[in-house]
Amino acid sequence: MAKILITESVHPIGPELLTAAGHTVVYADRDMDVIRREIVDADAVLVRIIELPDSLLATAKNLKIVSKHGVGYDNIDLDYCKSHGVAVTITPNANSLSVAEHAFTLMLTLAKNIIPVSDEYREIGFAAKNHAPGIEMTGKTLGLIGMGRIGKHVLHMCKDGMDMHVIVYDPYISEVPEGVEKVDDLSELLRRADIVTLHCLLTDETRKLIDRERLALMKPTALLINCARGPIVDEAALIEALENGRLAGAGLDVTDPEPVAPDSPLFKLPNVIVTPHYAPTTVESATRVSKIAAENINAVLAGQEPVGRIV
């Protein structure tokens, strides 16, 4: 029997699978005091977005696996895990469709001015009909940065569903689907795209990938969507561009820092939609991710090979 620490809330199917396998499950509910206390003798950690630095992992003397609830693993110290024989797994494909749908929804909601018009209707009545018109997405150019699992779903929705021209920037791929354009110069994508959407991992290379200089390349009518990781965008530069009319709007499911400060300008700008890292949060996705994350723990503790192993 092993001890499993779950740092944040997950769909109950995962903990049920762990308990059925004979393990003891401890819930921390994002309480860092509980996490620091319980990780000391934990055999496994199931984590969502709580940071697991080497200083914390080093206290976990029995740790055999860190099972990530999701696919982004920038909150886990991989170097420590590699050097100490701790397995690290992700849940590939489990939430990619939900995240892609969220990104697509942000695009449409911004393009059609849904939120400001709805708010105005409540405040001033039918005169809200005179709000500045939205735009059609059909026929526009999408700039897709990162064509992994999520990016491929977004590509399909925009190209096949909305007849958009899609430009892809991803230095790690060699081929793109027929009818899609691949560019090797990110600046070219930013200059040409009507909507730029980010679907890349957070690495040293992608941190502040979208900085002040690159934001300045974008059309003033363009929209920026980020459902990847907050630090990929220089948030101060983004706010400045939005406030000064150099960018038409932004849809952000992730921010830097996270959560957003209550007094952040992002909450005050009418051309910004901010959601609380909510893109993966669907009934279907939550079920799949929790199940796979738990199955990975059970597999490693049973001496079997898990899915989505990165360490």
Model feature map: region roles:
Residues 150:
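Hydrophobic/small residue at the entry helix of a nucleotide-binding pocket
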Residues 28, 145, 169:
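The conserved SAM/SAH-binding core of class I Rossmann-like methyltransferase domains
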Residues 50-57, 167, 171-265:
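Rossmann-like adenosine-cofactor binding region
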Residues 43-44, 65, 195, 223, ...:
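Short, Asp-centered acidic motifs that coordinate Mg2+ and/or phosphate
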Residues 84-86, 92-141, 145, 153-157, ...:
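Phosphate-binding beta-alpha-beta segment of Rossmann-like dinucleotide-binding domains, i.e.
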Residues 82, 89-101, 116, 258-311:
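C-terminal helix-to-coil terminal segments
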Residues 23, 86, 180-181, 271-272:
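Short, conserved active-site loop motifs that form the nucleotide-linked donor/cofactor pocket
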Residues 1-89, 191, 211-213, 217:
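An N-terminal-biased, well-structured beta-alpha scaffold segment characteristic
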